[in-house]
């Protein structure tokens, strides 16, 4: 890297991860040399279906309503992003635009110019590298052009949170760009929302666990993880061997996935997941509330974001009265049935934005009943993969 890029990277790292204390802290574990990124030996356990081979109603009945993860193929075939989101093209078109790669200790975004980030991505040897996880591109006058390059798959277009308004709704869409070893720590997506993640280039390794899996089984302890306990790669180093051991409880058996370019992962609300990039990756991901999962999302939003829920309900009464009637029928005194991560129900996670997310209902009472947070503090945990 040239001096200007090197200076930009050092400044960004100091803001985003001051606890790592310089270059040695970022490479101390030597994962660039000793972590196996090959995936040919991994048994992928998630089925694939072509998006044109199933109707919307069938998708709801087979996957969304029973909350079963699945990989969709063919959904991105017509996207302009397939051509426009090559790293060289992004580096040229958005070279001087700043994208979020983390947060500082006060919860404010740490950003980096695309031209510097792409150079960093190509040359870095960090254990858990900086990761573009930008959720504000849609509101930026120049970066918003990225919205023209893709559209949500048809199964996910009826997003009820849109009625809360773009400025009021929780962060919900992210462009994610990262090198090998970057990723997201173990988490549950915010407010009971489901998510889709479409991969443009590269390969991602996922592990997913059912909602009832106890959080303490999935966490990397601070003692084990040290300064990297919230990072995806550290999870695979410390927890993955336990998951694959004969003593792992069968009732918490995981799903293991290798996501390839052109594949879209559907993550139902409540599923724990951790993601590791195996090479240079570019993806887009969105969280959503649909008529199918609305009863859970409403329950968690009322308890976790009461002011937002009031504004949302007023809009639903006008534009979607049939959904507003469902809201009136939700018993807020009963538990929702989906686990919550203590930091996630005002949000979720990335290696560049600390795990925005125990066991099912015991933790829900704390996560879903947190009061309205200040916007600056919410930003720190409002990112997901």
Swiss-Prot record:
User: What binding details are noted for the cofactor?
Assistant: Binds 1 Fe(2+) ion per subunit.
Source organism's superkingdom? Eukaryota
Annotated GO molecular function terms are: histone H4R3 demethylase activity; metal ion binding; P-TEFb complex binding; peptidyl-lysine 5-dioxygenase activity
JmjC domain boundaries: 141-305
Listed EC numbers: 1.14.11.-
Chain residues that bind substrate: 184, 204
- Specify whether Oxidoreductase is a keyword of the entry: yes
Q: Which UniProt keywords apply?
A: Chromatin regulator, Dioxygenase, Iron, Metal-binding, Nucleus, Oxidoreductase, Transcription, Transcription regulation
One annotated Gene Ontology cellular component of this protein: nucleus
Composition bias of kind Low complexity appears in 340-357
Its annotated compartments are: Nucleus
Instruction: Name the predominant localization.
Output: nucleus
Q: Tell me the residue numbers annotated for binding 2-oxoglutarate.
A: 197, 285
Instruction: Specify where the region named Disordered lies, as residue ranges.
Output: 337-385
EC supergroup of this enzyme: oxidoreductase
According to its UniProt entry, the protein's GO biological process terms are: peptidyl-lysine hydroxylation to 5-hydroxy-L-lysine; phagocytosis
Q: Where is this motif: Nuclear localization signal?
A: 377-380
Query: Where does this protein hold Fe cation?
Result: 187, 189, 273
Q: Pfam families, from UniProt?
A: JmjC (PF02373)
Q: Name the residues that span the membrane.
A: none
**SMART domains in UniProt:** JmjC
User: What is the role of the protein in this entry?
Assistant: Dioxygenase that can both act as a histone arginine demethylase and a lysyl-hydroxylase.
Q: Which family does it belong to?
A: Belongs to the JMJD6 family.
Q: What is this protein called?
A: Bifunctional arginine demethylase and lysyl-hydroxylase PSR
Species of provenance = Hydra vulgaris
Identify the gene encoding this protein: PSR
